[in-house]
């Protein structure tokens, strides 16, 4: 890994050191995705069946998975894996149940009652990528909060042939319908509906550049669907002092690097000696990984930055605004106070990112590409919306009436003023 001393860099070099890999061929991807969406809108299920063969090399005759197929998948699944999934399920459920909002009701002025009520989004679509690493854990991260929030209809899409663990998790979480469809076409089907696919109000879940672009396009169409967030390549930043275990640090860096060639990992440490030990350990562990080729490409986009102290390390982290922030120092909770931007934070030597990815209870769907400066990790609130209520008695109306008349008049909104004036006159 490239090693840089932060204080030796000029402003432009510092900016380059924290630069993320460019998302390539964006215009080309946009055109392809537009074409795929149009096909699904025009041909419905037929387009999805054709796309399954073209993109996923899967011959299918239907889109919707039957209950029998789900039952058989659960029977085939390894019992140890089932038990591990249940452990994760319970922790994720506990953490998200704790996020159930309390309704707010107060009297702002005598006779003026104001409330905040929460209501679930009615129909949600969950997208689970396929490929060599089936992300069945993402089913838990999406479906559990959807169920707790009270969404009336929860549907799930994943490329054919859907992994048994994905089907097991979907059944466990109470998903209503499962569709074997993938990529941009799946996003289009969820946004607009087909003969077999329910049109949803909001789409959740990660995916490749085509899925991300499809989510962007359908969310900008008033007839499409809302989305959870715009996701970029996965990333981690690790802050480590000289007493950190370089083996632990390297394993945390590589656990993120193996996600994909466009993932990025950054280590911020305090000395050349630790930087060298960590870099050597990364190379040693990398050689043993089955996904070595993917992780190697990610490591090429990554670097080690040497900070003069932990305060500067925090400054670097806040500038980068990582998806995952791991702090392996002697007093990690002390540093937490200075963290401004991060999707999820992992404190101490025994809090690897893997715990949050699977079973600690927090959600692993996180903003990337610097969006943690303005966006939050996925939570229960994303599956619901708030509405406000006000109720004024005659006494409350009279208390505010004159002030509202003056405010409306000065904004030159006469109908607003009249709505108050007519009522005031009726009470004389």
UniProtKB/Swiss-Prot annotation:
Swiss-Prot/TrEMBL cofactor(s): Zn(2+)
Active site: 323 (proton acceptor), 324 (proton acceptor)
Classification via InterPro entries: Ald_DH/histidinol_DH (IPR016161), Histidinol_DH_CS (IPR001692), Histidinol_DH_monofunct (IPR022695), Hstdl_DH (IPR012131)
Catalysed reactions listed for this entry: L-histidinol + 2 NAD(+) + H2O = L-histidine + 2 NADH + 3 H(+)
Alphabetical keyword list: Amino-acid biosynthesis, Histidine biosynthesis, Metal-binding, NAD, Oxidoreductase, Zinc
GO cellular component: cytosol
Gene Ontology MF annotations: histidinol dehydrogenase activity; NAD binding; zinc ion binding
Highest rank taxon of the organism: Bacteria
Binding site residues for substrate: 234, 256, 259, 324, 357, 411, 416
Entry EC number(s): 1.1.1.23
Co-factor note (free text): Binds 1 zinc ion per subunit.
Family: Belongs to the histidinol dehydrogenase family.
Protein name: Histidinol dehydrogenase
Name of the encoding gene: hisD
